[in-house]
């Protein structure tokens, strides 16, 4: 190689995008201590976040979005922060679609809009929610590829549970899909995202803990409408996609069967992080309803 340039310098092993955020420590002498990739920055470096680097805790005092810099100061607290984001997905193109026993699976191109709208303070060891806050940050938009599962409206509405329990079960299915799918794709759970939408209207279902003032009633799907037909999306967390979601489409029933086995094998009563998610997040009846949804689809 005779050029003065070194090709490997322009290729990151950690991130597709080179548009990283620099973390600046202002505790003593100002210095840069880390870089965070663009897709993770708003969730980990938002104002009032606790950023952990090399075992040290840092409080994020200011995030300069345009300059791609976050200013932090050392701290010592007994909690960590967890960002609350709201993801909206719009289907742009369907590459493949097939019907399974009682549901449909698809693979295609989607437009993803993600906005960090708040954060929770979670206490170490006990995992108690000890506080929260609202945030107003720019949206992160990208085109990527996605796999999605469509649950027929007649199956969803015929379940013998209350509307609240059915929605809880839907979130439970999304949770277990998000955690089981990476085992088949041989990737990290953070390499893919999950979202729930309405196949009949194209609207997205907001997470349960989203601040009320962020919601727009015109954008919310009508859960109680008989036309509401849930889509559960598992999408590549990288612009353009990196080939993860097509492998889920090829699995057909195997993915759903493994999700059902995972829930049934878990000894908990109402739900836990090993199956449909913590009870406080998944809601009442989530485990039982999630099992019924999967059984009906298979």
What is the predicted role of each segment?
Residues 1-45, 49-55, 62-298:
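Extended, highly charged accessory segments
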């Amino acid at each position: 190689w005779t050029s003065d340039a070194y090709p490997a310098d322009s290729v990151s092993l950690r991130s597709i995008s080179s548009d990283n955020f620099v973390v600046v420590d202002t505790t003593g002498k100002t210095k840069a201590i880390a870089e965070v990739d663009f897709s993770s920055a708003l969730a980990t470096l938002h104002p009032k976040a606790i950023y952990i680097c090399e075992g040290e805790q840092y409080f994020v005092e200011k995030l300069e979005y345009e300059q791609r810099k976050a200013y932090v100061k050392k701290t010592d607290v007994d909690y960590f922060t967890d960002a609350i984001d709201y993801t909206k997905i719009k289907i742009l193109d369907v590459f493949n679609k097939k019907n399974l026993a009682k549901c449909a699976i698809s693979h295609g191109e989607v437009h993803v809009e993600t906005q960090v709208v708040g954060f929770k303070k979670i206490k170490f060891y006990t995992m108690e929610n000890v506080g929260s806050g609202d945030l107003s940050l720019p949206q992160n938009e990208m085109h990527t590829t996605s796999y999605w599962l469509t649950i027929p409206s007649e199956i969803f509405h015929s379940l013998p549970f209350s509307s609240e329990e059915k929605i809880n079960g839907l979130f439970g299915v999304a949770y277990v899909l998000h955690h089981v799918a990476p085992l088949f794709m041989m990737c990290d759970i953070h390499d893919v995202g999950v979202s729930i939408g309405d196949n009949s209207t194209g609207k997205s279902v907001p997470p349960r803990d989203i601040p009320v003032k962020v919601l727009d009633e015109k954008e919310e799907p009508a859960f109680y409408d008989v036309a509401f037909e849930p889509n559960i999306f598992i999408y590549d967390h990288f612009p353009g996609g990196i080939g993860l979601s097509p492998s889920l489409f090829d699995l057909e029933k195997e993915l759903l069967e493994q999700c059902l086995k995972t829930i049934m094998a878990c000894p908990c009563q109402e739900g836990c992080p090993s199956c449909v998610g913590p009870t406080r997040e998944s809601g009442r009846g989530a485990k039982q309803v999630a099992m019924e949804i999967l059984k009906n689809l298979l």
